[in-house]
């Protein structure tokens, strides 16, 4: 059984992952739709930039976030001057780091789902008088929803497992930024904390497994729905 402190770590991880997913979802969908449906110069470069967090060391991503959101960074300075807000050493900063790391996976899953929608259906709707927004809301979005949700769940799984960018950007503050991966890392540094490592690791694996199964089921549902059409 987990004690109160350990349950707090789990709750913080779920909060960080949930906020990261919710904030990143509309951004990821917009980027996925842009890459799937719009032709523009430099599309390959934009696609590569979106997927950079997948290949760049997470520490580098965390450092770049620190430069951007730090007290002397352009975004951090703006947040402090206008809203009196700082994300350094805060759980909100951990959510930002998790969202950035999850973004490429979400965009990729959503883009595949949008591209799977037959353009002939969209063209047929337009010939019947439907405008671009109506085609999007009544056809493209409903058909791609299962894939979009699958990408969101996959992003959530990635968010709750984020370590490198988080510890670099917002450090490892118990009760504030110490999510499950960071708590496991801290426990590994403590002699005789093997039981704690096991408990937290089992919770982490369990949450990730549930999220991955949900993502797979949604992906299959999306495939069946499009196959029927």
List the predicted regions and their residue ranges.
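Periplasmic/extracellular loop-to-transmembrane helix junction in inner-membrane transport proteins
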Residues: 1-22, 34-43, 80-84, 186-195
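Membrane-interfacial helix termini and adjacent extracytoplasmic/periplasmic loops
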Residues: 1-4, 62-99, 169-173
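Interhelical loop and adjacent transmembrane-helix boundary motif
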Residues: 1-5, 169-209
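Hydrophobic positions within alpha-helical transmembrane segments of bacterial inner-membrane proteins
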Residues: 17, 21-29, 33, 59, ...
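Transmembrane-helix boundary motif in ABC transporter permease subunits
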Residues: 19-50, 63-65, 113-115, 120-121, ...
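Transmembrane alpha-helices
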Residues: 22, 107-110, 114, 118, ...
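C-terminal transmembrane helix and the adjacent membrane-cytosol boundary/short C-terminal tail
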Residues: 42, 108-122, 126-130, 194-229
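Non-cytoplasmic
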Residues: 70-71, 148-186
């Amino acid at each position: 059984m987990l004690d109160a402190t350990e349950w707090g770590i789990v709750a913080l991880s779920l909060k960080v992952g949930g906020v990261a997913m919710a904030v990143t979802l509309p951004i990821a969908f917009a980027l996925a739709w842009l890459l799937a449906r719009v032709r523009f110069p430099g599309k390959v470069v934009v696609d590569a930039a979106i997927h950079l967090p997948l290949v760049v060391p997470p520490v580098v991503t965390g450092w770049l976030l620190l430069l951007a959101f730090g007290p002397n960074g352009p975004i951090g300075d703006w947040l402090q001057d206008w809203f009196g807000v700082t994300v350094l050493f805060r759980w909100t900063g951990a959510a930002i780091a998790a969202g950035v790391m999850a973004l490429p996976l979400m965009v990729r899953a959503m883009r595949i789902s949008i591209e799977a929608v037959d353009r002939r259906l969209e063209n047929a709707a337009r010939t019947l008088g439907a405008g671009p927004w109506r085609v999007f809301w009544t056809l493209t979005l409903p058909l791609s929803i299962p894939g979009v949700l699958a990408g969101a769940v996959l992003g959530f799984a990635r968010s709750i497992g984020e370590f490198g960018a988080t510890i670099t950007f917002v450090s490892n503050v118990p009760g504030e930024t110490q999510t499950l991966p960071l708590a496991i890392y801290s426990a590994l540094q403590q002699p005789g904390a093997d039981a704690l490592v096991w408990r937290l690791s089992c919770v982490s694996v369990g949450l990730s497994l549930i999220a991955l199964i949900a993502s797979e089921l949604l992906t299959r549902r999306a495939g069946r729905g499009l196959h029927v059409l």
